[in-house]
């Protein structure tokens, strides 16, 4: 019988339970266990926000926090995390400076210690929310607080597919500048919290920018758009080991099964 081609024969001494197992070479190796030195960054998109439903550009002026539905969405995620314990023991909790992200982080915080009251059986408390402007949605400049119809009337149309270097409005960011800013912020967080679990409450654009900046297949595409639909209160998880970013999950909106 002809064996598998070189590089794919991963068992030495097949049939002998005491034989050593030879791992596949680096080029085809898959890693499921978290390396001891790895950093994990869990990015949570905020729940539905007032600016999402009112059609307002939601920077510092335009953001009015979460809607009641948005709070319920985040509470659903929190309840799932309490049920699974998957973020218990996370080391730090960040949010952008925008109210919708801060509210999201505050609602999720109890799941980091596994208790709705925000304190663990051992007396520990959920980490305080650390705000970081580098995690904000694209800075809108003079567009902040305008409705999108007002934006179009004042600034005209915007085509980032054609010109990703064009600022959204005077004083605002371009798409390329935004992606680069997010990439730098994530690198800084991963370096500061090496070997830790970092939870980040942020925005759909920030998550899209992370994919553009950190996925090898998207390398060099800072001016591109991925046409994603990142759901409210969803999780996107990265693992960083020796500066290599590995995507573990995107748009995770799973909720606990109902109790019957």
Feature-to-residue mapping (PLM):
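GST superfamily/GST-like fold recognition
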Residues: 204-208, 241
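Short beta-strand scaffold positions
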Residues: 95-96, 180, 201-202
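Generic beta-sheet signal
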Residues: 41, 91, 189, 196-205
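Acidic, low-complexity terminal tails and accessory targeting/binding regions
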Residues: 2-40, 138-149, 196, 212-260
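Active-site catalytic microenvironments for nucleophilic, acid-base chemistry
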Residues: 80, 107-111, 188, 192, ...
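Phosphate-handling substructures
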Residues: 51, 111-184, 239, 249-251
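Active-site metal-binding loops of divalent metal-dependent hydrolases
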Residues: 47, 204, 251-253
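Active-site-proximal alpha-helix that buttresses catalytic centers in soluble enzyme cores
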Residues: 2-28, 35-39, 45-122
């Amino acid at each position: 019988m002809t064996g598998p081609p070189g590089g794919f024969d991963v068992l030495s001494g097949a049939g002998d339970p005491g034989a050593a197992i030879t791992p596949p070479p680096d080029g085809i190796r898959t890693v499921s266990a978290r390396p001891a030195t790895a950093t994990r960054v869990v990015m949570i998109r905020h729940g539905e926000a007032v600016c999402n439903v009112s059609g307002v550009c939601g920077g510092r002026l335009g953001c009015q926090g979460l809607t009641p539905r948005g709070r319920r969405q985040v509470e659903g995620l929190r309840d799932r995390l309490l049920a699974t314990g998957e973020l218990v023991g996370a080391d730090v909790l960040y949010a952008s400076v925008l109210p919708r992200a801060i509210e999201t982080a505050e609602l999720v915080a109890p799941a980091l210690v596994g208790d709705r009251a925000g304190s663990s059986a051992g007396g520990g408390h959920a980490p305080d929310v650390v705000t970081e402007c580098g995690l904000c949605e694209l800075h809108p400049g003079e567009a902040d607080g305008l409705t999108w119809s007002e934006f179009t009337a004042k600034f005209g149309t915007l085509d980032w597919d054609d010109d990703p270097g064009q600022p959204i409005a005077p004083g605002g960011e371009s798409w390329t500048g935004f992606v680069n800013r997010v990439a730098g912020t994530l690198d800084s967080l991963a370096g500061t919290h090496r070997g830790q679990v970092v939870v980040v409450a942020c925005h759909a654009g920030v998550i899209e920018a992370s994919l553009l900046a950190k996925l090898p297949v998207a390398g060099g595409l800072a001016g591109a758009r991925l046409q994603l639909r990142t759901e409210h209160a969803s999780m996107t998880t990265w693992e960083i080991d020796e500066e290599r970013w590995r995507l573990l999950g995107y748009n995770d909106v799973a909720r606990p099964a109902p109790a019957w």
